[in-house]
């Protein structure tokens, strides 16, 4: 089992968790391919972390399985923006810590279409 950790990335943890849940349990090669076509900043970041985890363990991406994909909240950068009448309001710029574990395995996450095809006997 190999791991990769990316800390203090300027990315909202709630938005990144949406993508992280989708790739958990998937084959690493399939996950990287699907993330490549996802129009999201979190997808680009997660793709690089998954590739790094595969490389850290000297694994083959075709046989690697994403065991765990976790996105934790990092510190929040606070900035201020000037407003009317001399006031200023805060802007929160959240950061995240992305953690991916990859292990040797050949099972793939079953999708709805795959289950449907199996039920029909295709």
Swiss-Prot record:
Segments for region (Disordered): 102-122
Keyword list, A-Z: Ribonucleoprotein, Ribosomal protein, RNA-binding, rRNA-binding
Keyword rRNA-binding: yes
PROSITE patterns for the chain: RIBOSOMAL_L22 (PS00464)
GO cellular component: cytosolic large ribosomal subunit
GO biological process, one term: translation
GO molecular function: rRNA binding; structural constituent of ribosome
SUPFAM superfamilies for the chain: Ribosomal protein L22
Function, as annotated: This protein binds specifically to 23S rRNA; its binding is stimulated by other ribosomal proteins, e.g. L4, L17, and L20. It is important during the early stages of 50S assembly. It makes multiple contacts with different domains of the 23S rRNA in the assembled 50S subunit and ribosome.
Subunit relationships: Part of the 50S ribosomal subunit.
Assigned protein family: Belongs to the universal ribosomal protein uL22 family.
Protein name: Large ribosomal subunit protein uL22
Lineage: Bacteria, Pseudomonadati, Campylobacterota, Epsilonproteobacteria, Campylobacterales
